[in-house]
């Protein structure tokens, strides 16, 4: 079943999906191309705005999608191409055994609670931020890192703001809203709108809730945003109209020295869980998979391919994890808060245009989706290439 709310797929990852035959005709069923990315101050005035995807001259769009619907689309594509037995639902990895260096064994618990073991040539751990594969590979890793930000997420049906598909960040580092549509407007002009409400608190006492993700009630957090009321947006009313709300802390893990242990590798959140400030966690997971594929073609199905993947991505993406801790592209709101408390009349007198453009350009380059670099890049995997 479809779970989750919204996420963004950056042009570098959309390029890879298109190459796999998962193009606009399919992605339009689970989301829509992003037209604009905008930051606004606490008083609702524009700090920075830019077109995104093909609207900005990229050869590929940026997509805002419903996370659960994207999962279902990818699941259906795998089943159609690889057969009904290709995916075992309800199972989770418990760990692995490398006593035979040429044939690792993955230990799995199935949905009915039984434990099974599978021999394999390569094992790719894509089991998320609580990865059992990573825990075994790096038993001395630091605990989950929480920097003090708490997020509440939800959806509602409403008219899009600013444009038919604008990604909006509003407020300050201490209190902010992220709002964007994840469906095209219906006959009444209403889209499914994804919203994220965030506050930053003192994290010295650690996360005190029993779970990392829970359903919550409006009264537990809406008071933080009572003054987010503008002539173009009434945030308190928007929150009251939401279908549901979920709470989770903004968490990641400290980077690790390697994502690979011989024939075993990590990818996605198992390798590099990162703050969602750059909207590129899902995109990087897609890139991981494609780089692994490219290395398998170059080196064959064996540890050399995984070593090549690790050599190409581990260090730069580890740096991106740390960069996202400083708020990623939302770091402009940090500057704004430091210089004027988030309230201004003329943004040019607070953060000049050249400073804003330079800040954003550095982040895009670090995240791998700077426009000219991406548009000129050769295909990750050549058409027709096989292992």
Map each language-model feature to its residues.
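Conserved mid-domain beta->alpha element of the FAD-binding
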Residues: 124-125, 152, 179, 220-221, ...
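C-terminal helical "tail/cap" subdomain of flavin- and related membrane-associated enzymes
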Residues: 44, 257, 278-280, 294-387
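Acidic/histidine metal-binding catalytic segments
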Residues: 29-30, 86, 227-244, 302-307, ...
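Conserved FAD/dinucleotide-binding core of flavoprotein oxidoreductases
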Residues: 46-71, 109-117, 157-244
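Short beta-strand or tight-loop elements
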Residues: 89, 102, 173-175, 246
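Glycine-rich FAD pyrophosphate-binding loop
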Residues: 1-5
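Conserved N-terminal helical subregion
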Residues: 10-155, 205-207, 214-219, 364-387
């Amino acid at each position: 079943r479809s779970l989750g709310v919204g996420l963004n797929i950056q042009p570098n990852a959309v390029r890879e999906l298109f190459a796999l035959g998962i193009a606009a005709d399919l992605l339009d069923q689970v989301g829509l191309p992003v037209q604009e990315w905008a930051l606004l101050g606490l008083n609702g005035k524009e700090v920075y705005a830019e077109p995104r995807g093909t609207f900005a001259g990229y050869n590929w769009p940026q997509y805002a999608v419903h996370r659960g619907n994207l999962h279902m689309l990818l699941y259906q594509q795998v089943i159609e191409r690889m057969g009904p037995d290709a995916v075992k639902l309800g199972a989770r990895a418990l760990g692995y055994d490398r006593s035979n260096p040429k044939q690792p064994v993955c230990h799995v618990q199935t949905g009915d609670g039984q434990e099974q073991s599978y021999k394999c040539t390569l094992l790719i751990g894509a089991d998320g931020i609580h990865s059992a594969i990573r825990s075994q590979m790096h038993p001395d890793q630091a605990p989950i890192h929480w920097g003090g930000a708490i997020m509440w997420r939800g959806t509602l049906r409403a008219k899009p703001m600013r444009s038919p598909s604008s990604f909006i960040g509003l407020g300050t580092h201490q209190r902010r809203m992220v709002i964007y549509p994840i469906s095209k407007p219906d006959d009444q002009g209403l889209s499914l709108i994804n919203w994220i409400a965030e506050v930053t608190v003192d994290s010295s006492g650690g996360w005190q809730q029993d779970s990392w993700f829970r359903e919550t009630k409006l009264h537990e957090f809406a008071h933080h945003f009572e003054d987010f009321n503008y002539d173009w947006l009434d945030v308190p009313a928007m929150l009251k109209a939401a279908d549901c709300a979920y709470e989770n802390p903004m968490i990641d893990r400290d980077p690790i020295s390697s994502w690979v242990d011989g024939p075993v590798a990590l990818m996605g959140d198992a390798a590099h869980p990162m703050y969602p400030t750059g909207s590129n966690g899902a995109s990087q997971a897609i890139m991981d998979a494609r780089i692994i594929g490219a290395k398998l073609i170059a080196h064959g199905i064996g540890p050399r391919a995984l070593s090549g993947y690790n050599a190409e991505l581990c260090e730069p993406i580890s740096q991106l994890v740390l960069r996202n801790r400083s708020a990623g592209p939302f770091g402009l709101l940090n500057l704004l808060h430091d210089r004027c408390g988030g309230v201004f009349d003329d943004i040019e007198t607070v953060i000049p245009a050249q400073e804003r453009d330079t800040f954003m350009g550095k982040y895009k380059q670090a995240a791998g989706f700077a426009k000219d670099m991406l548009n000129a890049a050769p295909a990750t995997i050549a058409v027709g290439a096989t292992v």
